UniProtKB/Swiss-Prot annotation:
The chain crosses the membrane at residues 104-124. It is found in: Cell membrane. The keyword Coiled coil applies. This is Inositol 1,4,5-trisphosphate receptor-interacting protein-like 1. The gene is ITPRIPL1. It comes from Homo sapiens.
């Protein structure tokens, strides 16, 4: 009877845990597991292990208590022939047994109240699971006079008719691959051409106390190899600048809590002896001068007069100086090339337009940057479209860090991965997407989709991005961004990301900082959130109809 009682209680415990597992982890029709399901399953495994451990401890405690009672009764009755507890005897009582009943059946009949509560708990859990499977975008606002009606988008209903692997491959080859066939060679030419201009600028500014130009760095979609047809004619180049001898740049960062990540570049005088070690007993003529500040002032007076507002480097003045340098440099190297170069006006970047005789043209945007310490974080001259900054504010840019991250992924990932193809397919569809009625510009940008991709590249093994997983990974990116829209939350990839590889050189304060929400403006502006949801829904419609209809140009 002892063995039967223990076996019965073990069976009941296992049945209880099995029911709990089915309730908390229902099997879906699809064989794919999203990130939330994976996290819930791991939490459930831990909870089940903890519950099993508690049940075993409770059983052992009850068993010891029963043994103590048996010994005490044997002592008072004089029966000391055996000190072992025989479970299941009516006079001794089974720990999980009601009076007058024997075995597990008696326990069930004697604890109808607990059984009823357990059934109510099961019903509640089933209802809760059904409610959780129907998330919807809430884009209504009490402040708006006219309520905006948005069709809910769940995380399951639109995945059922998602395009197949073959349909996505066909679309990619027809609309993306053919358009970017010559993109790698064009990127290589653009970088070499800009380097040629920069070398000519160095020759022209050798005798001037102006900022020095470093080697350029190709950034953006074209150079990160996720460019589409729209990016094949537009190229972004970062040109770092450093102070001339006798001058130093001091970066004064503004408080990020104010909502803007930017800083000012303070121009100060600096003696060369602080940078270079003087040999032997050579004396510094500046610091041994009666008035060192007067000598140092002459070294930085020209740059302050030409490029500064007050004591800070002015974005517009610096870009205009750089634009003039590019024009003079072109005069030195024009004989090498067979196209016409023009410089369209711009206040935050130096734009170059290359017109060929065939009618083809290339647009190059040269963005100036001041490096922050020994990292790949720069203060750049070009601000995002939605930000309004003063002429001495230089926005903070992580584009070089992101460029390095994607480069490392391409180096260590298996051959022919699909992570860039996913982004190219999404952006190719968005380029042919009409804006919602009354909208002047889109809310969702290519940077939002790129951020979602980079987050998933850290969460999923690189082997999960094989070519035959294109359809699944494309669904993951759309699901990730859709959930972010629903929650009005999309964290910046680099700021506050503890999972970022240490090979990405960013300041330690950024790793330990609070995450930055790229969708914060959607929290403050319900109308913008409604537009973003509509844009996302239109994109889903385009993806689902991908195999059946050709692309049409947006008006």
């Amino acid at each position: 009877m002892n063995v039967d009682a223990e076996a019965s209680m073990a069976v009941i415990s296992l049945l209880f845990l099995a029911v709990m597992y089915v309730v908390h982890h229902p099997l879906m029709v699809s064989d794919r597991m999203d990130l939330d399901t994976l996290a819930r399953s791991r939490q459930l495994e831990k909870r089940m292990s903890e519950e099993m451990r508690l049940l075993e401890m409770e059983f052992e405690e009850r068993k010891r208590a029963a043994e103590q009672r048996q010994k005490a009764e044997n002592f008072w009755t004089g029966d000391t022939s055996s000190d072992q507890l025989v479970l299941g005897k009516k006079d001794m009582g089974w720990p999980f047994q009601a009076d007058g009943q024997e075995g597990p059946l008696g326990w069930m009949l004697g604890n109808l109240w607990n059984t009823g509560l357990f059934c109510l708990f099961l019903v509640f859990e089933l209802l809760r699971q059904n409610m959780q499977h129907e998330p919807a975008f809430d884009s209504s606002s009490e402040e708006e006079e006219e309520e905006v009606r948005v069709v809910p988008v769940t995380s399951y209903n639109w995945l059922t008719d998602f395009p197949s692997q073959e349909a996505l491959d066909s679309f990619y080859k027809h609309y993306v691959q053919n358009a970017i066939r010559d993109l790698p060679c064009t990127c290589e030419f653009v970088e070499s051409f800009v380097d040629d201009l920069i070398e000519a600028c160095r020759v022209l500014s050798r005798q001037e106390a102006h900022p020095q130009l470093e080697d350029c760095l190709g950034i953006g979609a074209a150079f990160e190899k996720w460019g589409t047809l729209h990016e094949t004619q537009k190229f972004d180049i970062l040109v770092p600048i450093v102070p001339p001898q006798g001058t130093m740049f001091v970066l004064e960062m503004r408080d990020p809590a104010l909502g803007r990540r930017c800083g000012c570049v303070l121009v100060e005088s600096e003696c060369v002896c602080k940078r270079e070690k003087l040999l032997g007993d050579v004396l510094c003529l500046v610091h041994h001068h009666r008035d060192p500040s007067a000598v140092l002032g002459k070294c930085s007076s020209s740059i302050k007069a030409a490029l500064c507002t007050g004591f800070h480097l002015d974005v517009c003045k610096t870009v205009q100086w750089f634009r003039n340098m590019m024009g003079n440099a072109w005069a030195l190297v024009a004989h090498k090339y067979d196209f016409k170069l023009s410089l369209p006006p711009s206040t935050t970047s130096c734009k170059l337009r290359l017109d060929y005789r065939s009618g083809r043209f290339l647009s190059i945007h040269l963005v100036l940057g001041v490096q922050r310490e020994d990292t790949l974080v720069y203060l750049v001259s070009q601000a995002p479209d939605q930000e309004q900054l003063t002429s001495v504010d230089w926005p903070e840019s992580f584009v070089a860090c992101e460029h390095l991250f994607l480069k490392l992924v391409g180096r260590f990932a298996p051959e022919n991965t699909c992570h860039l193809k996913c982004l190219q397919i999404i952006l190719s569809l968005r380029q042919h997407q009409s804006l919602p009625h009354g909208a002047s510009r889109p809310i969702l940008t290519s940077y939002h989709f790129k951020t979602a991709l980079m987050h998933l590249l850290l969460r999923l093994p690189l082997t999960d991005w094989a070519h035959n997983m294109l359809s699944q990974r494309l669904q993951d990116i759309l699901w990730f961004l859709g959930r972010g829209l629903q929650q009005r939350s999309l964290h910046h990839f680099l700021i506050g990301n503890n999972f970022l590889p240490l090979t990405i050189p960013i300041p330690k304060t950024f790793r330990n900082a609070e995450p930055v929400n790229l969708f914060q403006h959607l929290v403050l502006n319900p109308k913008a959130h409604s537009q973003a949801v509509e844009e996302f829904q239109n994109l889903l419609t385009q993806v689902k109809t991908l195999p059946h209809a050709p692309l049409a140009a947006a008006p």
